[in-house]
Regions:
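Fungal secretory targeting signals
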Residues: 1-25
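C-terminal accessory segments of proteins
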Residues: 21-381
């Protein structure tokens, strides 16, 4: 397990993984710059790949897919991913409801239905891990995209979100900020307003129609066509989704219960009494903001949802692989804040993905190179 010694200038971290890797000593400057995260990511990458190298069936080393930060993807893969997402927006819905029209909408419907069971509980991390994997399969099966699946390291863009290669409105982005709206408020308390607020005006998703939601509508699943809105918010990003925020989440949480609660801003204290504020989960979501990006239930309709959640999964992947033998665990029940009360979750419990994909056990999503069915790792940026 991790042991931490912190001074004003230096954070010393010493740990051994199942493969004997040692975590270096980091200065605060290394944490703030992202150098610490790069090193931690490399340790996790090597640890996971070593497991895959020992496999003789399932997820063998030659089958492992490498997930990359958006800016490290080739231009061909950026365009291919973006075009495949647009392709899903042309495929028919499987739900047979009046509101959702497309297979892309179905992801919003599934997230809407599952929200009370996959947030602030035992399945938060692993359900969303598999949710992204299901999307990856649909992009391949229905739209022919077999390239890199992206993650978005929020901290690389805090302070200049408009210029992020993910949101700069270029042909290889996921569209732009929304048009600026005067006198609007931030979508989350404790932050300054963002720099947009209106409809996305440039890039591949400028003409995207959001078909369902919002949560507060009388019938959230009724057909309600409107534009995609964004309100990129650097203040949120700096406060809750920075490289320091992400790195300290990994370093100062020695149990999965604290890790998942800290990521979701539940007010827990980590190792040494460390606090995490609103948490990187909300920090990433509200760095994008807008509609449906700020909608707890329907945020999966925002194209940026998936690179955002891939980055959160990457942090979990790193955290797990820093002490793999001890970190194949879950904590909590099967309902949000245990309301209504439910038993503690166990690894054999099922997580729901129908009709998009068959349901799987929590255990099946535990290891990204476990091969049942996952087989991927995260490359440091």
């Amino acid at each position: 397990m991790l042991s931490l010694v912190k001074t004003a200038a230096v954070v010393a971290v010493v740990a051994s993984t199942a493969l004997g890797a040692t975590i270096p000593t980091f200065t605060q400057a290394q944490i703030d710059s992202g150098e610490a995260m790069r090193q931690l990511g490399k340790i996790a990458y090597d640890t996971a790949m070593a497991r895959a190298a020992k496999a003789t069936t399932g997820c063998t080393a030659d089958k492992v897919k490498i997930r990359k930060e958006w800016r490290n993807m080739t231009m061909e893969d950026r365009r291919g991913y973006q075009e495949a997402v647009q392709c899903l927006m042309q495929k028919p819905s499987r739900y047979g409801l009046p509101g959702p029209k497309t297979l892309w909408d179905d992801y919003g419907v599934l997230h809407y239905y599952q929200t009370p069971y996959v947030h602030d509980d035992a399945t938060f991390l692993l359900w969303h891990r598999h949710f992204n994997w299901v999307l990856e399969q649909d992009l391949a099966e229905h739209c022919g995209y077999h390239g890199t699946f992206p993650y978005w390291e929020w901290g690389l863009d805090c302070g200049h979100l408009d210029a992020s290669p993910l949101f700069d409105g270029s042909e290889t982005s996921l569209g732009s900020n929304g048009a600026f709206v005067k006198n609007h408020r931030a979508a989350i308390g404790g932050a300054k307003p963002g720099t947009g607020g209106g409809c996305v005006t440039k890039g591949p998703f400028a003409n995207l129609t959001v078909n369902i939601g919002p949560t507060e509508a009388r019938n959230p699943l009724a057909y309600n066509p409107r534009c995609l809105k964004r309100d990129l918010n650097d203040d949120v990003c700096r406060k809750w989704a920075s490289l320091r925020n992400a790195t300290e989440l990994v370093l100062y949480t020695s149990t999965v219960g604290v890790f998942q609660s800290a990521a979701q801003g539940e007010g827990v204290r980590g190792d040494g009494g460390h606090t995490f504020g609103t948490g990187v989960h909300s920090g990433g979501h509200f760095s994008i903001s807008g509609d449906p990006g700020s909608d707890f239930h329907f945020s999966a309709l925002e194209p940026g949802f998936y690179p955002h959640h891939a980055n959160l999964d990457r942090l979990h992947f790193i955290w797990q692989n820093l002490d793999w033998a001890a970190r194949q665990t879950i904590a909590g029940t099967n309902t949000m804040f245990n309301l209504p009360p439910t038993p503690n979750a166990v690894l054999t419990d099922n997580m729901g993905f129908e009709p998009l994909h068959r349901n799987i056990t929590i255990q099946a999503a535990m290891d990204t190179v476990g091969g049942t069915p996952l087989c991927f790792v995260y490359e440091p940026w």
